[in-house]
Amino acid sequence: MMTTTVDQTAIDPITFEVLRNGLDAIADEMAYTLVRSARSTMIKDCMVYSAALCTASGDLIAQAVNFPVMLCSTPDALYIVADKFRDNLAPGDCIILSDPYEGGSHLPDIFMFTP
């Protein structure tokens, strides 16, 4: 019988908070950039958008402080994109997805993913 051990390195609370707040700040900057460059009144005035950082496997690691309900369909959309483009993505690529049958909840949902 084979046993495996998992090396769980503990992280001190201060380092954890510094990293967590840094990731949250990145997500917030993504959201602010979207608002500053948007032409849609739904984004600029109604603030109906979300921004988040996810792992390559689709797990959420940080989200901007805005409309979090939009993040509910993000993992499904990310899985679709990862499945179709996983082997062909390079730094600088941006995949735009607007398909209610492929992860979005309705047609106006637009997802942008970058590796």
Predicted regions mapped to residue ranges:
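Glycine/proline-enriched, intrinsically flexible loops and inter-domain linkers
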Residues: 2-91, 96-115
